[in-house]
Amino acid sequence: METDTLLLWVLLLWVPGSTGDIVLTQSPASLAVSLGQRATISCRASKSVNTYGNSFMZWYZZKPGZPPKLLIYRASNLZSGIPARFSGSGSRTBFTLTIBPVZABDVATYFCZZSBZBPWTFGSGTKLEIKR
């Protein structure tokens, strides 16, 4: 999937916490992690987002005043230019975004998104902060 096409769809359909046929439950809502430690964010779909052997789950990072940035596509594939500190895993209904180690620049809100069925839907977001 080309990044430009995906970004256009995301910008057109960006409705955090929206609901459709598939509901995404993201947790935790907020997370404070020390620099250098691991952050783990979970996303559970109300039904499987697997089709033809692919898991249609994406992860985005959003910072104030910036468009969402694609980190992970199809559950575990790292988008070009994204550091290997970011990784995705999971299948069917249960997915995880891991950031290890966390850096100061990772302060943001992270969203899961399913692209298996129209309308594409998003989780409600996880706000990552640095523990002082």
From Swiss-Prot:
UniProt xrefs under CDD domains: IgV_L_kappa
Please give the residue ranges the record annotates as the region Complementarity-determining-1. Answer: 44-58
Q: Name one Pfam family in it.
A: V-set
From the UniProt entry, list the residue stretches annotated as the region Complementarity-determining-2.
Answer: 74-80
One GO cellular component assignment for this chain's record is:
immunoglobulin complex
The cross-references to InterPro entries, in alphabetical order and at most eight, read: Ig-like_dom, Ig-like_dom_sf, Ig-like_fold, Ig_sub, Ig_V-set, IgV_Light_Chain
| GO biological process terms on file | adaptive immune response; immune response
Using the UniProt annotation, give all residue ranges assigned to the region (Complementarity-determining-3).
113-121
Its domain of life reads Eukaryota
> Disulphide bridges in this chain?
C43-C112
Q: Where is this region: Framework-2?
A: 59-73
* Keyword annotations from UniProtKB, A to Z: Adaptive immunity, Bence-Jones protein, Disulfide bond, Immunity, Immunoglobulin, Signal
Q: What is this protein called?
A: Ig kappa chain V-III region MOPC 321
